[in-house]
Amino acid sequence: MAGQGLPLHVATLLTGLLECLGFAGVLFGWPSLVFVFKNEDYFKDLCGPDAGPIGNATGQADCKAQDERFSLIFTLGSFMNNFMTFPTGYIFDRFKTTVARLIAIFFYTTATLIIAFTSAGSAVLLFLAMPMLTIGGILFLITNLQIGNLFGQHRSTIITLYNGAFDSSSAVFLIIKLLYEKGISLRASFIFISVCSTWHVARTFLLMPRGHIPYPLPPNYSYGLCPGNGTTKEEKETAEHENRELQSKEFLSAKEETPGAGQKQELRSFWSYAFSRRFAWHLVWLSVIQLWHYLFIGTLNSLLTNMAGGDMARVSTYTNAFAFTQFGVLCAPWNGLLMDRLKQKYQKEARKTGSSTLAVALCSTVPSLALTSLLCLGFALCASVPILPLQYLTFILQVISRSFLYGSNAAFLTLAFPSEHFGKLFGLVMALSAVVSLLQFPIFTLIKGSLQNDPFYVNVMFMLAILLTFFHPFLVYRECRTWKESPSAIA
């Protein structure tokens, strides 16, 4: 049966990778799309009378309001990308895969059609389209992350691979920009993306489960076109019960796996994890690093325009370079491989000591969390230096840092908390971090206004905040030390 199921699992994996790569995270290619919108005179009426023919080529200050409008659209889109993860996570947990994916397809298709038929006169519709596009994209990601459960001990690698593909999909807007420069209209590109929704529908019913993919994977598990494979309702309920028992045992140490200990485990509700110190510091870690990334992406067009002295040819070159570097799918799996390798190492140690598998999972996340903070610090340092050629290095550090950020986030929540709460905890941390991400617009306004386009003081504050994020892996490391000294102390 395993041999028969492997081709289906591989097909699900590869098509899910393509879906995340081509559709899920396109919002983060925003600078490329802004370049096209400016050439199409979107929000051109906000520019002063002395502005050049393509925005702020000759009068940078005159198009400040136009830049702010594009920044506001990105702020709203990125906010919805995170904030709506909580309700969409609930939808996924409550109504399962098929319903969640059909909702995603509806939002995504509607958004791409709106963008396809907008023009400079109806540019305000972007405020509706971009949030809808991101809601559909994040639902694609959430429903695909469970595919890692099909591959057992490689689960972290698959999760980080999908998050890397999510990041890399920002290159889609670069392709649209390049096609636009070759004469393919914006409308034609987005109509093509809309037509691709038929593929999403087919994949939903042929290569995805109606419900959830359980972990650990029960014997003879099947899904897709013939999900039941003759399995009766009673057998399914028995398999689900056994799966819940296996999941519970994952979060109990060898000494605690007694009939009485199961009763203690049931007392741990979703809110007990949501209000834990571990979750709180993870929220701080994610919010600070993510805010810096969002601010950088949302203001990149304006930043490059200032550094290039209004030379739009150079701005186009660096915008293309930024988009070309956005293939996080190439570096994200290294993060997952690191965690999987460390987890296997700590599992051997746990078998010798009879220690908790939760502690094993926690220990495997420490290097990844710390490395993500270090990469972001390097990225912030390079971005703070107003030398245009140095931004090539900034772009590389940015994509590696962002790939590690979202891969580490999803993997940490998967490994550090019970899987039955993953959808809700993932949604909650993204929703709360979305509230923090709203700060990007007032910060952008501050830079454009009081600081007179000089982001130096803002960059210094962000670097100090990024240093604070190192406290999260330090606390997780302390928990691991506590486990080694007293295995029953980890909960």
Swiss-Prot record:
Keywords: Cell membrane, Glycoprotein, Lipid transport, Membrane, Phosphoprotein, Transmembrane, Transmembrane helix, Transport. The chain crosses the membrane at residues 17-37, 72-92, 102-122, 123-143, 156-176, 188-208, 279-299, 319-339, 356-376, 396-418, 427-447, 456-476. Glycans are attached at N56, N220, N229. It is found in: Basolateral cell membrane. It catalyses: guanine(out) = guanine(in); hypoxanthine(out) = hypoxanthine(in). It comes from the Eukaryota. The modification Phosphoserine is found at S253. Widely expressed with highest levels in the liver and lung, followed by the pancreas. Highly expressed in macrophages. Adenine transport is strongly inhibited by decynium-22. Sodium-independent purine-selective nucleobase transporter which mediates the equilibrative transport of extracellular purine nucleobases such as adenine, guanine and hypoxanthine. May regulate fatty acid (FA) transport in adipocytes, acting as a positive regulator of FA efflux and as a negative regulator of FA uptake. This is Equilibrative nucleobase transporter 1. It comes from Homo sapiens.
